[in-house]
């Protein structure tokens, strides 16, 4: 019923699949990919465009893992494959070793690009790399906090970056906490001094930074 409802109300739906179904993966709950696979079939049948999202980490960055997910997406008529960079935030804060370096990300991007170009299949999903993944034309190190995105947590906290969360899903640093919608409107929060720290100046990612890097007024 939910798939039919979505099919009549939204254009596309995206789900996370870091590894193929039934393949163990320590960064996700058991059967996570199995549930995504079931949803893909139901949503395609309901007429939705369907995308898969893979969060690339040191635990799933091998050629075999990438090829398996891409081949599954091809075989199941997935429309889009998005590849994001892993950040040790939220539940992932317990796995800092899963974080890939810029060089590892760039090598992974090139590997996937070559794999997609060379795989002889009839249907291929569009492949979209996250802007913080070096090695492709959309890559930029410029932070998008507040200027392009924010996060709103279940308790009403508004954070400048939805990756800036600790293992208890609180802001990793006070500078990322902009306010709470229980006490102020979202417009008031986004016009506030803490938000202007991010919106008034262009700067690079400050996740894991003990001090603010050089910033420039844009």
Task: Specify the residue positions occupied by each region the protein language model found.
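Generic alpha-helical structural signal
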Residues: 37, 67, 106-113, 187
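A C-terminal junction/extension of Radical SAM enzymes
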Residues: 49, 86-164
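Flexible mid-to-C-terminal extensions adjoining Fe-S/redox cofactors in radical SAM and related proteins
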Residues: 157-158, 162-218
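Flexible, glycine-rich phosphate/dinucleotide-binding loops
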Residues: 22, 59, 89-90, 165-168
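Radical SAM/AdoMet-radical enzyme domain recognition
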Residues: 1-85
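Short clusters of hydrophobic/aromatic residues that line enzyme substrate/ligand-binding pockets
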Residues: 24-27, 100, 143, 178-181
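Short acidic, glycine/proline-rich loop/turn micro-motifs
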Residues: 24-27, 92-96, 171-172
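Short, solvent-exposed polar/charged micro-motifs at secondary-structure junctions
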Residues: 1, 62-63, 93, 134-143, ...
């Amino acid at each position: 019923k939910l798939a039919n409802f979505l099919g009549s109300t939204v254009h596309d739906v995206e789900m996370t699949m870091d590894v193929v179904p039934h393949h163990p993966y320590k960064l996700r709950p058991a059967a996570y990919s199995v549930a995504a696979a079931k949803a893909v079939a139901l949503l395609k049948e309901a007429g939705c465009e369907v995308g898969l999202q893979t969060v690339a980490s040191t635990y799933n960055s091998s050629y075999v893992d990438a090829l398996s997910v891409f081949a599954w997406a091809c075989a199941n008529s997935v429309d889009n494959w998005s590849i994001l960079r892993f950040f040790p935030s939220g539940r992932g804060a317990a796995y800092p070793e899963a974080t890939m370096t810029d060089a590892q990300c760039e090598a992974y991007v090139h590997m996937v690009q070559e794999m997609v170009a060379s795989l002889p299949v009839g249907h291929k999903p569009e492949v979209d790399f996250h802007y913080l993944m070096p090695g492709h034309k959309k890559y930029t190190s410029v932070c998008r906090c507040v200027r392009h995105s924010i996060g709103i947590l279940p308790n009403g906290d508004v954070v400048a970056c939805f990756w800036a969360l600790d293992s208890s899903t609180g802001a990793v640093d006070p500078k990322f906490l902009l306010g709470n919608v229980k006490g102020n409107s979202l417009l008031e929060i986004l016009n506030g001094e803490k938000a202007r720290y991010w919106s008034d100046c262009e700067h690079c990612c400050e996740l894991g930074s003990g001090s603010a890097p050089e910033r420039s007024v844009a």
